[in-house]
Amino acid sequence: MKSRLHPSLWFKRYARDQEGATAIEFAIVGPLFLSLLFSSIEMGWVMTQSMMLESAVNRTARSMQINSAAFSAVDFKRTVCSHAIVLKNCEEILNVELSPVDVRGDIPTDATRCVDRAAKTVPLTQFKPGNGNQIVFGRACAVVDVLTPGLGVALSLPVDSSGGLRLTARFAFVSEAI
């Protein structure tokens, strides 16, 4: 014959039972820990892409500073993309702008124009390398995908209509007189 426990005794026995305690703890703490882990990976990847873009643009600008006549917009993008190896489809996602500056107030103050992946258009920008001994200001923008779009820090990143994150780099140099 099966003995029935009084409900209060059954509850006391159930409350003292330790089986499954770690599963409940993991269900509470696990998502927070995983979100922190993926956010750290996301920010590391974004920083890597941003630093590679910045470095590639600076290296290309240094080359252009000495030999500006040999560079077109396509050559500039191609050279940047050869240095920025972590950017996928670099030539498709990169937009470059280059303009001579006469005085300090001529530096563009508007937002850097980026590729619109949703409309599949590249904005019109000028690419004028400048003459000898002229200050040249340039901007580059690459639109990259986030790794974890619906998780952690990626939720707070400023993304465009296609879900891409805009990475920008700015540079200035004086064209060498040849």
Across the structure, where does each feature detected by a protein language model lie?
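Short, conserved structural patches
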Residues: 2-3, 58-178
